């Protein structure tokens, strides 16, 4: 049995905390310069780390809330609640910021596709574009939320192209590439608070938006549009005066198997996406010891899927773990693992290292920093490395021999894991962590 009232209170409480440091209008100065937003806490030194994890450099970004990441070549695209940054990591010991695009709109989930960048906005804005955009309520005339599209062909001077409105905004989004060079975008949406519930965000909701992007250049970015709003049913997330909502937080796709793993807050789901415009739920995944189904990732052999719980579990509680299931028989978990230290556990955003024969998961863990877990034996997970910055890391991913983390208040950290566990890992031309496009034997 799920705990919808508990999930609802946690989601709203977490949003309230983060909103305290969200930037307001898009502007050239930081939002706390005018006293409207309190400054973030100062950067903190490492609280603890394993001997096989090394911090190489930091591209600081003190301001607002830093969120998710995407990668292309030597560039990292780092979302934040006031826009996004582009950072050059060609010299890992000296990460260099190339651009910081100010375009208000939490929460800044980001992906890249050729010359294009897509940015999620799930708080109603006063305007679709960047200039003068500020947080408003869903009932404000002209309020907009959805996905913004940018041309990043010149990483030092990104250009806003258009804003695609989606019902209930875009909390996160996931690319689903096509063989014709275009991509679909799955947009996961739900109301973060009562002020976000507008006429197009009504209970039970039960759907995602699908955007069609016909290519990967400027012309395709301008032509992108919503082409479907398929229904996805499950266990209600919110139960209250505003009605019973069902929605998904994050969607992971494994395109070679036409699979998706949807972390839908009140349950996990597996989808058949052989028809990408009409995904079909094939399995419901649940356990009473998961409170907020937040993220998912497939192993690179396609045999297992790992879900993360965003509950902020205290050391004595079962919550906040990662849970691993067999894709072909997900009725019961193979294992779960909490942060194996005396501190709160929350596995937040993560991916698997692309290495054949081993399943190594790299994850952010909020206040517990970055955690690296060996799941080669899915029944016996073991943390093999960690780096705790005594702050809060939103996203951590493996990318081309590096571990890259976006810390909520500090900015981007570049780390390296020493040892043989990841030897032979595949190098990638680009990475949108929620999109897995290949299998390894």
Residue ranges of each PLM-predicted region?
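Bacterial N-terminal signal peptides that target proteins for export
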Residues: 1-12
């Amino acid at each position: 049995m799920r705990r919808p009232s508990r999930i609802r209170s946690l989601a709203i409480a977490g949003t309230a905390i983060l909103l305290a440091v969200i930037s307001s209008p898009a502007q050239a100065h930081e939002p706390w310069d005018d006293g409207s937003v309190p400054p973030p806490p100062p950067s903190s030194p490492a609280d603890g780390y394993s001997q096989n994890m090394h911090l190489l450099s930091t591209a600081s970004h003190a301001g607002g809330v830093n969120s998710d990441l995407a990668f292309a070549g030597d560039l990292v695209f780092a979302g934040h609640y006031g826009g996004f940054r582009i950072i050059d990591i060609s010299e890992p010991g000296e990460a260099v910021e190339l651009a910081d695009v100010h375009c208000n709109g939490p929460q800044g989930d980001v992906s890249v596709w050729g010359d294009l960048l897509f940015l999620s906005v799930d708080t109603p804005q006063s305007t679709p574009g960047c200039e003068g955009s500020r947080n408003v309520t869903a009932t404000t005339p002209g309020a907009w939320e959805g996905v913004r599209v940018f041309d990043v062909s010149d990483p030092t001077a990104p250009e806003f192209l258009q804003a695609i409105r989606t019902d209930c905004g875009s909390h996160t989004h996931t690319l689903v590439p096509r063989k014709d060079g275009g991509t679909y975008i799955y947009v996961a949406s739900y109301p973060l608070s009562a002020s976000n519930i507008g006429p197009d965000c009504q209970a039970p909701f039960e759907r995602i938006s699908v955007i069609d992007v016909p290519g990967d250049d400027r012309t395709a970015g301008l032509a992108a549009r919503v082409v479907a709003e398929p229904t996805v049913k499950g266990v209600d997330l919110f139960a209250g005066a505003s009605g019973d909502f069902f929605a998904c937080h994050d969607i992971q796709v494994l395109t070679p198997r036409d699979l998706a793993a949807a972390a839908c807050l009140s349950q996990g789901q597996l989808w058949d996406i052989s028809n990408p415009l009409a995904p079909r739920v094939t399995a419901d995944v649940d356990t009473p010891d998961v409170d907020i189904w937040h993220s998912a990732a497939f192993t690179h052999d396609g045999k297992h899927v790992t879900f993360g719980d965003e509950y902020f579990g205290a050391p004595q509680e079962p919550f906040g773990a990662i849970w691993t299931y067999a894709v072909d028989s997900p009725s019961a978990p193979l294992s779960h693992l909490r942060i194996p230290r005396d501190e709160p556990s929350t596995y937040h955003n993560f991916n698997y290292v692309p290495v054949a024969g081993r399943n190594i998961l790299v994850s952010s863990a909020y206040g517990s920093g970055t955690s690296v877990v060996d799941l080669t034996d899915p029944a016996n997970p073991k943390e093999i490395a960690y780096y705790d910055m005594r702050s809060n890391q939103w996203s951590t991913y493996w990318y081309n021999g590096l571990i890259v983390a976006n810390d909520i208040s500090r900015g981007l950290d570049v780390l390296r894991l020493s040892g043989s566990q990841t030897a032979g890992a595949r190098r990638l031309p680009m990475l949108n962590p929620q999109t897995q496009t290949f299998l390894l034997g």
